[in-house]
Regions:
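GNAT-family acyltransferases
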Residues: 1-118, 181-182, 189-203
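Conserved hydrophobic/aromatic "anchor" residues
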Residues: 33, 135-137, 165
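Amphipathic alpha-helical segments that line or abut small-molecule/effector binding pockets
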Residues: 39, 126-138
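Short, conserved glycine- and acidic-residue-centered signature motifs
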Residues: 104, 125, 129, 180
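Acyl-donor binding region in acyl/amide transferases
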Residues: 110, 117-118, 122-123, 127-130
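Conserved active-site alpha-helix within GNAT-family acetyltransferase domains
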Residues: 122, 126-127, 151-169
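Conserved GNAT acetyl-CoA-binding A-motif
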Residues: 138-148
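Conserved catalytic-core motifs of GNAT/GCN5-like acyltransferases
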Residues: 146-149, 166-186
Length: 203
């Protein structure tokens, strides 16, 4: 008699995904979204460079009603974590960090971040990535966090490398950019790696 294969064990979504924490660093504070963030994101998403770096169609974030509906629903999500990035020096919301695409059996998530012009070139993005990746491994008990970064965004890739993300491979010509095509690099960081360097692999 053939044995009937057992059903795979599906790891439930962590309860911690329902908790939207406040994470405090030296330069940035990550917190749940508030109503006032909508105006900040409308300005950020209207920036042509932001639209290009994120692969978003021009004008996609210009509708305040759509933005308000989106960001007002982020704190209620139970299978992902969306947090606003706040510059502690000014109190301004300058971007966001997101852990999404939860894969229960493999304890993995996708990561993405968006930092507007007001938050660039001062280490805010690097610290924000470290804070949320650390939370993902230490509180959400993730095993793997992955991302994709476009070839025309070396600044973002350097940030990810500083935190310990490792390039795994290339997705060829995944984005139409003007008259050409752009590749993207797949990067990831694993829980055992984080346990060793805690976001400072080159220290």
């Amino acid at each position: 008699m053939r044995a009937v294969p057992s059903s795979p064990t599906i790891r439930p979504v962590p309860v911690a995904f329902s908790v939207k924490p406040t994470l405090i660093g030296e330069r940035v504070l990550l917190r749940p979204f508030v109503d006032d963030d909508v105006a900040a994101f409308q300005a950020v998403l209207a920036d042509p460079e932001v639209a290009r770096l994120t692969g978003s169609p021009p004008g996609e974030g210009s509708d305040p009603g759509r933005l308000r509906a989106w960001y007002s629903s982020r704190n209620a999500q139970t299978d992902r974590l969306d947090l606003a990035v706040v510059d502690r020096a000014t109190g301004a919301c300058v971007g966001e960090v997101v852990l999404n695409e939860w894969d229960g059996p493999n304890r993995s998530c996708n990561f993405r971040t968006l930092i507007g012009p007001a938050g660039r070139d001062r280490g805010l993005g690097t610290e924000a990535v470290r804070l949320v990746v650390g939370y993902g491994f230490e509180r959400l008990e993730l095993h793997r966090i992955s991302l994709e970064v476009f070839a025309f965004n070396p600044r973002a890739r350097r940030v990810y490398e500083k935190v310990g993300f490792v390039a795994e491979g290339m997705l060829r010509q995944v984005l139409r950019d003007g008259g050409g095509w752009v590749d993207a690099t797949v990067m990831s960081i694993l829980a055992p790696e984080w346990a060793v360097h805690r976001g400072h692999p080159h220290s």
